[in-house]
């Protein structure tokens, strides 16, 4: 996802693989994702050592979740420390597409299958990974996952307070090399809509698990 956006200007993205968007990553992680996607795409149709052709495509997961997700575990533990309350940091209208990890794995299997077909349309292209998971804010999605575990919705933390915390955390990262989940970058992207409407159902014959 971050090979495309959200960009450093905080512009929302609602569209598919061919939607025009100002791709201007503002963080080293997003920049590296963009560079890797360009390298993989460029390698398509190249000749490898044994004279065979190499075919490539790129897959873009949009917020992976599922079994073994350490980030979800961290959020859950934070909620339990606050009396099973989730204090919100994200605007409700900042909608994000999410994808189950099993769908991402299955898309990789299907990509390997269909990229070998003569005349395959997926060669040299990039596709968002998708499923049947609801599109909503990060906070609301996490609440959907954790409500059966007894987590309740709390109040929203004021934006000025969040900005103060992110500035403090960014300074700690610079001075002491101590990273934090909440920083200026994560605050911006989580509060910027990124909703992908995918085309890979027809190209991959994909039927998602979730």
Curated annotation (Swiss-Prot):
EC number: 1.1.1.145, 5.3.3.1
GO molecular function, one term: steroid Delta-isomerase activity
Record keyword Magnesium present: no
SUPFAM superfamilies named among the record's database cross-references: NAD(P)-binding Rossmann-fold domains (SSF51735)
Keywords, comma-separated and alphabetical: Early protein, Host-virus interaction, Isomerase, Multifunctional enzyme, NAD, Oxidoreductase, Steroidogenesis, Viral immunoevasion
Induction conditions: Expressed in the early phase of the viral replicative cycle.
Pathway: Lipid metabolism; steroid biosynthesis
Chain residues that bind NAD(+): 33
Catalytic reaction annotation: a 3beta-hydroxy-Delta(5)-steroid + NAD(+) = a 3-oxo-Delta(5)-steroid + NADH + H(+); a 3-oxo-Delta(5)-steroid = a 3-oxo-Delta(4)-steroid
Single biological process term from Gene Ontology: steroid biosynthetic process
Annotated active site: 29
Endpoints of the signal sequence: none
InterPro entries attached to this UniProt entry: 3Beta_OHSteriod_DH/Estase, NAD(P)-bd_dom_sf
Job description of the protein: Catalyzes the oxidative conversion of Delta(5)-ene-3-beta-hydroxy steroid, and the oxidative conversion of ketosteroids. The 3-beta-HSD enzymatic system plays a crucial role in the biosynthesis of all classes of hormonal steroids. During viral infection, steroid production contributes to virulence by inhibiting the host inflammatory response.
Sequence similarity: Belongs to the 3-beta-HSD family.
Name of this chain's protein: 3 beta-hydroxysteroid dehydrogenase/Delta 5-->4-isomerase
